[in-house]
Amino acid sequence: MSAVNNACGRGDVISYYSWITDDSKIPLVQSQKESVGDRIVLNWVIPDVSPGAGGHTTIFRTISHLERMGLHSRIYLFQSTRFSDDQDFREFLKKYFSEALNEPSVEAYISVDSMTYAHATIATGWQTAYFVRRFNNTSQKFYFVQDFEPGFYPVGSEYIFAENTYRFGFKAITAGDWLKDKMRNDYGMEAESFGFSCDRSIYKPRERSDKKERLFMYARPVTSRRAFELGLLALNEIYKKRPDIEVIFGGWDVSTYDIPFKHKNLGTVQPEDLAKAFSECDICLVMSITNLSLMPLEIMASGSVCATSYGENNEWLLNDENTILFNNDPADICDKVIYYLDHPDLLAKKREAGMKLALSTDWEKEARKVYEFIVSSLSA
């Protein structure tokens, strides 16, 4: 989307992006610092939120774990017009994120205008980093990095705006080792990572309804980094060789696309239904051009096999033992999928290794890494 379109169709680029050039500093308020007390307080600045958003779910889950570990969190929305007041926002969180954000002592506010001193202030998206850069009413600044956000845009202004935030001098808390290494090596940031897990009360093996060959594809045509077109071309090649195969699409409504093979269009789907779909499939395709998503572990825990691309962005967690890895080429994806469908014994080994990996993960253990990084940084 162009900057002009982003600017509400008015071409008012300067006004729309005024927060990028705003260099007014928010100073330390000593009286607020002295009144906080001994318990460590964290300010989290988050972008606008919609029901079930994956990135926000990970943030809220981390906040809940940290709250139980003794770090008190306040959540502040940056540039949101969705809510009428703080209570409206809190009711929204309770309705849509109660499983992830399950500590009632966590505070939530609709605007950074009310933000007061905290020991640490944490940016959670590139837009929020611009506010945190000028917020000096804090002792330490962190950046909760879940993906390489410049990659969300064509090379241009917004790519640059996003990339520049990695040079603001914050300490990075990254989702996985690929981002940790990238923040350290490419931008000189001090960084620590946390790993992934999944909700095993939802994502678990289920008995299949039949033995029909079936594939799942995570379909997000509105999200370019999920490479929908690449996946669709690959599935069409598979269909030519396996005309009886069935495909399940989940993630977005694909009814407006010409799809010549038999398929089921789940559209946007609740986690329970997604887990059931995984369990019905031999192989689940997840295109991941930037950072790995949580979905591979969810697929594995559901008793299916994940297929995704080679690359450091994925292989910090996945490997050839637990995953079908392919080159980002329709022909190679087709060949790999057909090969493992033709060799069910080898597919079963990957399924077993994937389940073992999924069962070895734990969200609390990963949150402990975040806790230790924050506490050690504050005491340094």
Predicted regions and their residues:
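Short hydrophobic beta-strand element within catalytic cores of glycosyltransferases
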Residues: 305-309
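Membrane-proximal helix-turn-helix segments that form the acceptor-binding/catalytic region
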Residues: 108-117, 155-172
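Short acidic/histidine- and often glycine-rich active-site loop of Leloir-type glycosyltransferases
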Residues: 298, 310-325
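Conserved acidic donor-binding segment of nucleotide-sugar-dependent glycosyltransferases
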Residues: 320-331, 339-344
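Conserved catalytic-core segment of nucleotide-activated headgroup transferases in glycan assembly
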Residues: 58, 77, 182-189, 193-264, ...
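Acidic anion/phosphate-binding donor-loop and adjacent secondary structure
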Residues: 21-31, 150-156, 192-212
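A charged, aromatic-enriched C-terminal amphipathic alpha-helix characteristic of glycosyltransferases
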Residues: 342-376
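Acidic donor-binding loop of glycosyltransferase active sites
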Residues: 279-291, 304
